[in-house]
């Protein structure tokens, strides 16, 4: 069989050859992508070792070819690019599973990007090639290098060193490659066909990378200003800047381009620069050098990476051979000043600043004109002048802000600061037109896949810390105010009816017996208003209670909760507190901590609302008529006292409305998306007791103490259930029916209950609940469970639910509740005119979110219509 001819070109000098090479590399990279972390780390170490060993010949090659820089400094660069990069990533995981949390069901997996196009500059050819090839090997990417034409030989040689070592250690052949005869056409082709671009070079090249249509990681122009504050260590500052500026003849893009000195120390700084071998140009010499720095609006390439004496000679200026840095004392920071530009050579501009503010202003201008996003530097007393460091950091639009650090070495990382990532590609963020604002490294060259397994939301069961039950328990429970808590001052909240009819007397008698001072606020309205609550809170502030006792139905207990909030936190905003939430634990608004001033006790006098054990309260703004439903566990009473003796004389209408309200609480809690085994038992037992004992309470409550107590306990259990499972769209619609047409809340729930049961029972709902805690629509089966628990029978779930609906309707009729909204709102035209607004507000009600079926506007509207006319002519 004939041997297959190798069609991969060995010399890349045409678009066709490059395209073929990229295709071959993609195949090699697919193999490389299957390597384990152990295999990759072996290759990474071998490649770094080879580059490290070749640091001197590669440095010589770079200087010989480009005619720029200093061999000894390029040796350090090559050493940094191999040793420091290896050290930074030797133990970093870049293959397979990066992290996994089985409890949360989260796993993060690293995948390589593919083939990386690497643009290499002439200023740092070998070190940048080493850096980029190493990070690509560590991340299992292939890399094709586009060298600068003036540095192609040394760049390619560096890449060869890394490639040979990598292949010898097991890497696929051809995983690193390069363009042999670089051109703009080939570079553009490479950028268009690669998977990602790692660009280091001039602004034009970086812009081309970002305009290629491929993801790019680039750098920006540097124009680093260094401020020397009057509190700085002058020796440290001057010699650090010289150390930085002379390194490789100033070719690191983070090197200082200007030094800004406060006038108080200007002469001392200048003297130190001179003493350390820097040359200050006079006015005539400064002008000559100006014309040499910038030619035709661009940096003169002939000065880049040259010695000061060479640059001076180009300008026709004679200086000592050993001069370290040329310094031009200038005033303008405008772009028209040549010294204000990036110079990439041992040439510095020096400015005198009036003070620190003036220095920062000058630095801001220099950065804005040529160095957005790159690097800035400050020399200051870092111990005693933290405010100046903070001010500098706040105002510099640079991604590296260096303090008391030579910027060439400090900017590339892991030198002078060991948490700054080592890199030879320095991101400049959006300010510099980049996609990254940090030193580029391995994390930027991998795609991270996140595997997220389904987890159910954490649920809970919360109740008052103390719930006391049984007839006659109230005085015994109140005894704790003295014996256990040592309370001194009690504030009673109730309504005028209960106050006038002596309901508060057993409480005040007990308080008198215990020697606890008290006062009573008895102005709670049936729909408690904000102004009423504010009056109560004002009375509390004057009285300064350490205990609040709310006695009454839902209105008194809700009003008491609001007064409690206003008493302890008068700064609260009710609109913020009433904000809707999807998850009560993740809401935007954080409720203030309650109970720091007063202990809250709720004592119900009716069986229905459950407010004594819930974290809910409703308050009405008397000016706008807007009801603010508040929900937060901070509103949960600390103690609930459910003593049926307080409910014995409840009128029939209240008994019926509150009893059916409790039925709706239990049914909605059982059907809720947030229902749990803990709430289910309470809901079911509550329903059992109400169906059994509510008729007797309604008929002859005063003479049925057992029935009264059972219904009272049922209402509280239903309250506990919905305090944790929450309610649903029945309550959403009832709230608005009451608000728009003044239908009592319990009656409104009763009128909507059948429609909601039918709506929720749909096996093919238009929409499931949002973030449901169930895996499929199952509310029909849930309602059937209720029916069977109540002994209602049924051959199947559908029949059982029909039996449940009939039982609910029969109970409503038994306690005198009419069958349709029209019976309570006879003005049909008014009802229909307000229906759309009522529908929208019901949809937006806080209770809607926990409904097992997510309702659409049209579905809510149809339920209202069905309930209004008392029929089910159109299903929803």
Regions inferred by a protein language model and the residue ranges of each:
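Glycine/threonine-rich beta-strand-loop-alpha-helix active-site module
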Residues: 158, 531-645
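ATP/NTP phosphate-donor binding region
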Residues: 459-547, 821-822
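Conserved C-terminal structural/oligomerization subdomain of aldehyde/semialdehyde dehydrogenase
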Residues: 3, 33, 317-318, 322-457
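Rossmann-like NAD(P) dinucleotide-binding subdomain of oxidoreductase/dehydrogenase enzymes
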Residues: 97-236
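Gly/Pro-rich interdomain helix-loop hinge
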Residues: 740-743, 747-831
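N-terminal Rossmann-like NAD(P)+-binding subdomain of aldehyde/semialdehyde dehydrogenases
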Residues: 2-107, 135, 275
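ALDH superfamily catalytic-core signature
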Residues: 5, 12-14, 206-334, 361, ...
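Carboxylate- and glycine-rich phosphate/diphosphate-binding segment that chelates Mg2+/Mn2+
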Residues: 267, 275, 613-725
């Amino acid at each position: 069989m004939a041997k297959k001819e190798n069609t991969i070109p060995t010399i890349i000098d045409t678009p066709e050859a490059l395209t073929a090479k990229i295709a071959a590399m993609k195949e090699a990279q697919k193999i490389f992508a299957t390597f384990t972390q152990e295999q990759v780390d072996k290759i990474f170490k071998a490649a770094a070792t080879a580059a490290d060993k070749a640091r001197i010949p590669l440095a010589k090659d770079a200087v010989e070819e480009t005619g720029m820089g200093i061999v000894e400094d390029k040796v350090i660069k090559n050493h940094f690019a191999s040793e420091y990069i290896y050290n930074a990533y030797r133990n970093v995981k870049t293959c397979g599973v990066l992290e996994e949390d089985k409890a949360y069901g989260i796993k993060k997996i690293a995948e390589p990007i593919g083939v990386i196009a690497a643009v290499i500059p002439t200023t740092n050819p070998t070190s940048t090639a080493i850096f980029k090839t190493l990070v690509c090997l560590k991340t299992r990417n292939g890399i094709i290098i586009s060298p600068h034409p003036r540095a192609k030989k040394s760049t390619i040689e560096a890449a060869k060193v890394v490639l040979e070592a990598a292949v010898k250690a097991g890497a696929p052949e051809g995983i690193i490659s390069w363009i042999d005869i670089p051109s703009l056409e080939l570079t553009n082709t490479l950028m268009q066909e690669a998977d990602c671009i790692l660009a280091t070079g001039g602004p034009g090249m970086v812009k081309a990378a970002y305009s290629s249509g491929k993801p790019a990681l680039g750098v920006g122009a540097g124009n680093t200003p260094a401020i020397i504050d009057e509190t700085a260590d002058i020796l440290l500052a001057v010699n650090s800047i010289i150390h930085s500026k002379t390194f490789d003849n100033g070719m690191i893009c983070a090197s200082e381009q200007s030094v800004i000195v406060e006038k108080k120390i200007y002469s001392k700084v200048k003297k130190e620069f001179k003493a350390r071998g820097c040359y200050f140009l006079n006015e005539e010499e400064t002008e000559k050098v100006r014309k040499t720095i910038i030619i035709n609006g661009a940096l003169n390439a002939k000065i880049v990476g040259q010695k000061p004496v060479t640059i001076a000679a180009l300008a026709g200026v004679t200086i000592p051979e050993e001069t370290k840095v040329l310094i031009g004392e200038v005033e303008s920071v405008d772009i028209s000043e040549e010294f204000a530009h990036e110079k990439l050579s041992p040439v510095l501009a020096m400015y005198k600043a009036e003070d620190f503010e003036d220095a920062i202003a000058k630095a801001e201008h220099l950065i804005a004109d040529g160095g957005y996003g790159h690097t800035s530097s400050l020399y200051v007393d870092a111990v005693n002048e933290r405010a100046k460091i903070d001010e500098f950091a706040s105002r510099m639009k640079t991604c590296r802000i260096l303090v008391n650090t030579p910027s060439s070495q400090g900017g590339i990382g892991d030198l002078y600061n060991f948490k700054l990532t080592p890199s030879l590609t320095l991101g400049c963020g959006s300010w510099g037109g980049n996609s990254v604002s940090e030193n580029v490294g391995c994390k930027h060259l991998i795609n991270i896949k996140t595997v997220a397994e389904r987890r159910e939301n954490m649920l809970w069961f919360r109740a008052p810390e103390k719930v006391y039950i049984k007839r006659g328990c109230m005085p015994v429970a109140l005894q704790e105010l003295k014996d256990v808590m040592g309370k001194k001052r009690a504030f009673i909240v109730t309504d005028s009816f209960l106050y006038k009819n002596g309901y508060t007397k057993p409480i005040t008698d007990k308080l008198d017996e215990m020697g606890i001072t008290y006062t009573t606020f008895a102005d709670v309205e049936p729909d408690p208003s904000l102004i009423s609550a504010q009056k109560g809170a004002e009375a509390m502030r004057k009285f300064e209670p350490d205990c609040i006792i709310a006695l009454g139905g839902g209105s008194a207990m809700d009003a008491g909760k609001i007064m409690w909030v206003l008493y302890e936190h008068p700064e609260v905003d009710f609109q913020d507190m009433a904000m809707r939430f999807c998850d009560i634990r993740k809401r935007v608004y954080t409720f203030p901590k309650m109970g720091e001033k007063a202990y809250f006790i709720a004592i119900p006098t009716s069986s229905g609302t459950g407010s004594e054990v819930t974290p809910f309260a409703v308050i009405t703004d008397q000016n706008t008529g807007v009801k603010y439903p508040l929900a937060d566990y901070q509103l949960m009473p600390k103690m609930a006292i459910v003593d049926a003796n307080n409910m014995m004389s409840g009128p029939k209408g209240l008994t019926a409305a509150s009893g059916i309200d409790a039925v709706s609480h239990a049914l909605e809690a059982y059907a809720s998306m947030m229902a749990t085994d803990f709430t289910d038992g309470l809901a079911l037992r509550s329903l059992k007791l109400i169906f059994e004992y509510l008729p007797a309470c309604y008929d002859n409550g005063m003479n049925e103490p057992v029935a009264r107590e059972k219904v009272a306990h049922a209402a509280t259990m239903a309250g506990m259930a919905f305090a944790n499972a929450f309610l649903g769209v029945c309550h959403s619609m009832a709230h608005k029916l009451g608000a728009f047409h003044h239908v009592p809340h319990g009656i409104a729930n009763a009128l909507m209950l059948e429609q909601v049961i039918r709506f929720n029972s749909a096996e093919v709902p238009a929409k499931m609940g949002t973030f449901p805690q169930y895996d499929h629509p199952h509310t029909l089966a849930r309602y059937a469970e209720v029916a069977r628990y109540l002994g209602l029978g049924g051959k199947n779930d559908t029949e059982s639910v029909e039996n449940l609906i009939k039982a609910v309707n029969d109970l409503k009729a038994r306690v005198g509740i009419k069958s349709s909204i029209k019976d309570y709102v006879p003005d049909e035209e008014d009802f229909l005119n307000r229906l759309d607004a009522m529908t929208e507000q019901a949809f937006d009600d806080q209770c809607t979110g926990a409904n097992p079926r997510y309702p659409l506007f049209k579905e809510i509207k149809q339920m209202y219509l069905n309930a209004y006319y008392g029929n089910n002519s159109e299903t929803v």
